[in-house]
Amino acid sequence: MAIASFQKPDVKIFYNGVDKTDEFHWSNITIEDYEGDLSDRFIATMLWDNARPRMKDEIKVFINGYFLGKFIISAIRVDYKKSFDIEAVSVDFMSDFTKRKNRTFKDKSYKEIIEEIAKENGYKTKIDFKRMDEVNLLEQYDESDMNVCNKIAKDLELSFCVKNGYLIFFDRDDESHRINYFYNADDMISLSYEKKEKEVYQSCEVRWHSTKYARYKVARVGTKEPVLKITSLQKDESTALRLAEARLKSQKNLEINGNFSIIGTPFFAGAFINIKFDDTLTKKFLITKITHTINTNWLTSAEFI
């Protein structure tokens, strides 16, 4: 494969909003960016004599002028008198966002519920999905706000993530919210993928809770086997049936998993990568994880489906 030349990247570090690039003496930086609900991570290996950071302080990273993320310091690991590592994450796991709570969201839309959770935890929101104005009754019993967000996303077939101070929700099948990248396979440092057949469910059963009758009921789409069975926070049969239909529709009988590495590029997880192969055929994939490795060079690696 043809490979472009490596160049030393221009890295800028903002610490609690102040440019501390000249005081941030690092030898290696790794940034992990996920498409789903996993927390993005920033890891920097620092020279031993560098000033020690404080837990929960904020780090923003720019490479070659591109903003690559905002993170909260969550751990410091020491290799005595040699170096120390700073680990920072996009979600503060010691905050109220991850602590268990008990409450009821009554007569509120999904959008209002998400906005209330965001406001309580100091986040902004980016919300755009078909059912966001649907009024619901949602019970939060011994669950964290993050778990509630995950449940809403799972039940409504949404893409959900916490990035750069935002709670982001949109329909998983809505491509208008996803960036499209284009890359020639021959210009990649490495590219590998696997194809395999996957079982396709012919029917779907959704177990939902009826508040009117105070018991669980089952809504089903399809009559054939095999059957996908799920439990949902849906509160009526019509929304449970819509969920079942969405789950069946989202299935794929051919599963593709792959990865590639390229010269450092400001790609982000959740985007589409359109890869042009040597037979002039272009295939579109969803990037599920991006890893940026920065030292004297900048390498970008990705996982896709």
Task: Show which residues each predicted segment covers.
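Conserved "cap/hinge" positions at secondary-structure junctions
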Residues: 63, 171, 277-279
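Short, compositionally biased
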Residues: 74-82, 172-176, 284-297
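Assembly/oligomerization scaffold segments
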Residues: 1-95
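Short beta-strand-centered interaction patches in the first periplasmic/extracellular domains
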Residues: 2, 83, 90-92, 127-197
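Sec-dependent N-terminal signal peptides of Gram-negative outer-membrane/periplasmic proteins
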Residues: 76, 99-101, 125, 134-135
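Amphipathic, non-transmembrane alpha-helical segments in extracytoplasmic/periplasmic proteins
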Residues: 44, 88, 102-126, 140-163, ...
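An acidic/polar, Gly/Ser/Thr-rich interaction patch typically located in mid-to-C-terminal regions
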Residues: 25-52, 189-305
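Short peripheral tails and domain-boundary helices/loops at the edges of structured domains
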Residues: 79-84, 91-101, 292-305
